[in-house]
């Protein structure tokens, strides 16, 4: 009887195996291209407030970050990217405490915050409190029991939008690419002309006298933005209605004739207000850098 039952079991197993061999594996159904796939959330808006000034940044379709209040502003997006990196890393820091009294960290009624919004319109807000050893105490809204000490964040949201401007680069002017230089101060005008690598004025070789000036001309830089899209009265406030000195340069670049006009106005802190050619933005240039030009304007070629 046992042998008969065993044979019957083996026969049943063989029949099941033969039945399986004749069946084809059903192919996996491809994804329907007409059904939209869920996109991974990515940061698209960043808002920060230091308690008195609020700055808003937005990520455009090309991936670049702009100042949301005026997208024509020439933002140096490295500032926004650095802030974004800091904010995204907050909750990877070790918490200061898991049972914090917010008042102990200046967080009870904080007006300083950073809000990050992603492409699915989900927002996270972090509140900033008091400083400690170069860091600021932070908690995430909705998770107030956990406080973090975040380095550098307070300084990052304390900048003005002008501090974040991508400043224009000025041309490098040398005896090889300059056609002529004109320095005007009040009623005095001085024209400098390059000749075979040297500088002349009224036919005289003044190369040695212009050593400091020519070194600066080859390495001119703007220090900061003072006023972008200034109002009608800004020129007078910055001393640009009666400039201390104006430098006009005719030069060539990539085979084309170019010109540069640098207008130097009044002093502000450690620098002078300046404008560049047709750009009405008021910039700051350091007094140290401008010293050779100002000396030439005041004393001439003695």
Segments (PLM) and residue ranges:
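A short-motif feature that recognizes glycine-rich, charge-decorated loops
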Residues: 21-302
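Sec-dependent bacterial lipoprotein signal peptides
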Residues: 1-19
């Amino acid at each position: 009887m046992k042998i008969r039952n065993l044979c019957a079991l083996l026969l049943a197993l063989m029949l099941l195996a033969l039945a399986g061999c004749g069946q084809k594996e059903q192919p996996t159904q491809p994804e329907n291209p007409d059904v939209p796939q869920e996109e991974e959330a990515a940061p698209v808006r960043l808002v920060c407030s230091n308690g008195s000034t609020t700055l808003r940044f937005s990520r455009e379709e090309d991936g670049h970050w702009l100042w949301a209040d005026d997208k024509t502003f020439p933002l140096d997006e490295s500032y926004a990217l650095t802030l974004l990196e800091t904010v995204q890393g907050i909750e990877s820091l070790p918490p200061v405490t898991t049972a914090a009294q917010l008042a102990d960290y200046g967080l009870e009624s904080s007006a300083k915050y950073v809000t990050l919004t992603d492409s699915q319109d989900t927002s996270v807000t972090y509140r900033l409190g008091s400083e400690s050893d170069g860091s600021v105490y932070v908690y995430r809204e909705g998770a107030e029991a956990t406080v973090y000490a975040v380095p550098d964040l307070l300084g990052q949201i304390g900048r003005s939008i002008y501090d974040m401007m991508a400043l224009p680069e000025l041309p490098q002017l040398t005896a090889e690419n300059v056609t002529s230089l004109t320095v005007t101060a009040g009623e005095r005008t001085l024209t400098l002309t390059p000749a075979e690598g040297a500088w002349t004025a009224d036919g005289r070789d003044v190369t040695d006298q212009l050593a400091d000036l020519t070194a600066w001309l080859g390495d001119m830089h703007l220090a900061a933005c003072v006023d972008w899209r200034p109002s009608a009265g800004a020129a007078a406030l910055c001393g640009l209605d009666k400039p201390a000195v104006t430098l006009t340069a005719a030069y060539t670049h990539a085979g084309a004739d170019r010109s540069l006009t640098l207008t130097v106005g009044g002093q502000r802190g450690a620098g002078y207000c300046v404008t560049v050619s047709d750009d009405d933005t008021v910039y700051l240039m350091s007094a140290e850098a401008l010293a050779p030009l100002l000396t030439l304007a005041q004393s001439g070629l003695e």
